[in-house]
Amino acid sequence: MLLEEGLDEVFARHQRLAAATRAAVQHWGLEVLCQEPRDYSPVLTAVLMPPGHDADQFRQVVLDNYNMSLGSGLSKVAGKVFRIGHLGECNELTLMAALSGVEMGLRVAGVPHRAGGVDAAMALLEQPMPGNAPRHLAVVN
């Protein structure tokens, strides 16, 4: 898949998915762990939980309710962040599913947030990638 898609296209897709993820996080009123845009990762986004909310408990709520696994915080940020991956074969639709699971989980877990992060990500992803033809999706009947 990597060589078929092309390295430049893969890197651009990862950057695009990362930007959409950060748009959702920002809309929710949450913060990403990495504060410097030059240091943003194109393959995962670590999201800080608000004070008084444990990231590992939130991850468990999402797993129990939606059968979706989020990454955990490591070392000094264990229990303080959860991670959303947007690499490999992740595409616009799989990212939207992941962000929907996170937003539903925030509501179920009682984590303070502003609804609509999925819409913020969707608005970014609806814009065509520069220089690329639109992707065609298979329709399943």
Predicted ranges, named:
Residues M1, A24, G105:
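Short alpha-helical functional segments enriched in proximate histidine and acidic residues
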Residues M1-A19:
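Structural signature of PLP-dependent enzymes
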Residues A18-A20, V25-W28, R38-P42:
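Short gly/pro-enriched beta-turn/loop segments at secondary-structure junctions
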Residues Q26-E31, Y66-L70:
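Short amphipathic beta-strand starts and helix->beta connectors
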Residues E31-N65:
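Conserved PLP-binding catalytic core of the aspartate aminotransferase-like
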Residues V62-L70, M104-L106:
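A common structural junction motif
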Residues K76, K80-N141:
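PLP-dependent enzyme catalytic core of the Aspartate aminotransferase-like
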